[in-house]
Amino acid sequence: MNVDTTSPQAPLAGVESKQDGASNEATAKAESTTHDQNESSSFDERPVHSALSERQRSALLAVASFAAAISPASTTTYYPAITTLANDLDVSITQINLSLPAYQIFQGLAPTVAAAFSDRFGRRPVYLVSLSINMAANLGLALQKNYASLMVLRCLQSSSSGGTVALGQAVMDDLITSEERGRYMAYLTLGLVMGPALGPLIGGLLSQYLGWRAIFWFLMILGGFFFLMVLTFFRETNRSIVGDGSVPPQKWNRSLVQIFRKDKLIANPESLAKKRISVNPLASIQILRNKENFIVCMYGALLFGGYASVISIFATQLEERYGYSQVQVGLCYLPFGVGSILSRWTAGKMIDWNFKREADKQGFKIVKNRQQDLSRYDIEKARLTVSFPMIFATCGFVVAYGWLMQYDTHVASVLVVVFLIANVFTGVLIANSALLNDLNPGNGAALGAAMNLTRCLMGAGGVAAVTPLINKIGIGYTATATAGVWVVTLPALYLVYSKGYTWRKAALEASSQDRRENPDVASGSP
């Protein structure tokens, strides 16, 4: 009889196998836990993005925002005085209107230079120079007596104030991480939208009671006020000069508060940017050469052009349809400002919430006040998921605004819709700007110049086209056509939503492969 001597061993082998499996599984779990702890530790060990407190950062962004408001305010305070200016300078209203697109063209071009110098020498000195030139231009405008002087000085005024918009984007990039950009971006856009909202009211009051020259005296005083604010309180934020804010800048580049009050921050030289950026006025154009940047910038500019045309014709529509005075027209612009302010608590918080929600879905860890590497995060989905509903809402509200005006409905209904347009559109602007900042870390000034260039040129076209279009087809169909253009071109933005992350990964892999194949070039060796 044959005896199977292996039979008794079979169960033991099975037990050993199970024990080995359990042991391996436990080891794997332990290694996984250790890996997660190490990964978490690596996130926590990343340097703090800004050594400044939340209050300090908010204050700096508030100054940057209201300094940037000088640019659009210089446009809109001018609107109520157009007829008076034409009469006093003995020229046609058409000739005076030519100064509007001229202003916007220079407003778009000048920031490319301001951005380049701020990257090299710092934000603060460029603010001070820009505001000084702006004050001089407004002084000349208040004293000038002919049309040629008006055109030249308006272009100078535009060039000096336009740079402050790009500087605001640079300050945002210096201070704020991607996780917080939604709510902080609302601070930055506040001045940009408050300028158009309050400008007509202030311009109407000054023009009606003190004459058109008072508008430029007011703008000169406003520029002087912000010059003193920057001189006294605004500290340098350029990361190649002050790092996370703890490194003292050059003595000539310190605010008066820093000079007379000792800074309690402990200097961290390791937070300084690796190299000082050279002066390159074409940096903003280079940003637009990237297809993702180009699409997002151009769609944002298209939205801005439509919004600018809505603001520009609002005054004349109120005068013609409701017989309002300049002061009443100015008061009707207040819903634009209130709606924009409230976007800080509506759209801004929603954008930050969605950033965190999408990060959790993708397994992307966020650490407060640490700027994470977004190359492995689908940031396009995080930002544009919120943008699309707000874009459709903006389209709907603009159409409603046009037809309410067309049928001369009660002004209260128009003002409610105007409030909603401002609130939702500002949210789109915040999400658009946040995405572009995320895609271009460390290039805030050049990015601001690129955004300003595309928006101002599109805005100039929109403002120039809207009045003839309304005269031909009416404000209802004009508003519908504007919203239609936004909807028809929306697939371009959806392309960024669906393909943008893939494009970035491919570009990153190509860049890594190029460095491996050309190590001498990558290291800078001759």
Swiss-Prot record:
One of its GO terms (molecular function) is transmembrane transporter activity. The chain crosses the membrane at residues 59-79, 126-143, 186-206, 214-234, 294-314, 322-342, 384-404, 411-431, 446-466, 473-493. The keyword Transit peptide does not apply. It holds the Pfam family MFS_1. Keywords: Glycoprotein, Membrane, Transmembrane, Transmembrane helix, Transport. It is a multi-pass membrane protein. GO terms for cellular component: plasma membrane. It is found in: Membrane. Residues 1-49 are annotated as: Disordered. InterPro entries: MFS, MFS_dom, MFS_trans_sf, Sugar_transporter_CS. Residues 32-49 have a biased composition (Basic and acidic residues). GO terms for biological process: export across plasma membrane; xenobiotic transport. Gene3D superfamilies: MFS general substrate transporter like domains. Glycans are attached at residues 38, 97, 238, 253. MFS-type transporter; part of the gene cluster that mediates the biosynthesis of squalestatin S1 (SQS1, also known as zaragozic acid A), a heavily oxidized fungal polyketide that offers potent cholesterol lowering activity by targeting squalene synthase (SS). Belongs to the major facilitator superfamily. This is MFS-type transporter clz19.
